[in-house]
């Protein structure tokens, strides 16, 4: 929240994340996103430039844009696109702000027909914001439709390789919380 006080024009701020198995014993990887606004705008042409669980935004400014769009999937990405296309300043912190549980079931959820339809709605919304050209939209649509139809094992491989592999190092805050919880349960 210090960033919003120090930079009043900042509307959206996020950071890096690490994804872990449910027991926090195996790290799936780190999703790294760009930190500066120009880098974020460039990255947004190919991938989501924010890690949703790490994001904070100025509510009043987001509501002035209409709030979260009513799309069937990727609502966060559609909102970020609306913010960026409106010319608002965005940034990401270079450090890991979230250590989250992830899992292989994410791939299966993203392979459903319902998810594909929702994702298509989100892609159309992002195109309508003006963030993407039609050719960029078409490339995203085609790529995502093809990937979502691949076998889950192929999608898991693709998903894993989009994450930066890092050594498994349980976050200190988790160790403290886990220790406190075990003490409480006794």
Question: Where are the predicted features?
Answer:
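Acidic/proline-rich low-complexity IDRs
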Residues: 9-11, 64, 185
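Conserved nucleotide-sugar donor-binding catalytic segment
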Residues: 15, 21-23, 27-113
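A short, conserved acidic/glycine-rich loop-to-beta-strand motif
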Residues: 7-17
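Short alpha-helix within the catalytic core of nucleotide-sugar-dependent glycosyltransferases
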Residues: 1-6
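C-terminal subregions of glycosyltransferases and related glycan-biosynthesis enzymes
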Residues: 72-73, 78, 85-186
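Generic N-terminal initiation segments characterized by hydrophobic and/or small/turn-forming residues
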Residues: 7-9, 25, 183
């Amino acid at each position: 929240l210090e960033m919003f006080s120090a930079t009043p024009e900042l509307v959206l701020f996020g950071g890096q994340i690490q994804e872990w198995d449910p027991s926090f014993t195996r790290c799936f990887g780190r999703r790294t996103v760009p930190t500066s606004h120009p880098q974020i705008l460039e990255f947004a042409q190919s991938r989501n430039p924010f890690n949703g669980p790490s994001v904070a935004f100025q509510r009043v400014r987001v509501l002035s844009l209409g709030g979260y769009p009513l799309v069937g999937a990727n609502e966060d990405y559609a909102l970020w696109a609306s913010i960026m296309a409106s010319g608002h300043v965005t940034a990401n912190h270079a450090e890991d702000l979230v250590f989250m549980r992830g899992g292989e079931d994410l791939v299966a959820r993203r392979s459903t027909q319902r998810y594909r339809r929702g994702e298509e709605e989100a892609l159309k919304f992002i195109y309508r914001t003006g963030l993407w050209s039609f050719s960029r939209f078409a490339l995203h649509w085609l790529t995502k439709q093809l990937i979502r139809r691949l076998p889950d094992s192929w999608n898991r491989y693709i998903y894993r390789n989009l994450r930066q592999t890092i050594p498994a190092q349980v976050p200190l805050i988790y160790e403290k919380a886990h220790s406190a919880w075990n003490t409480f349960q006794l």
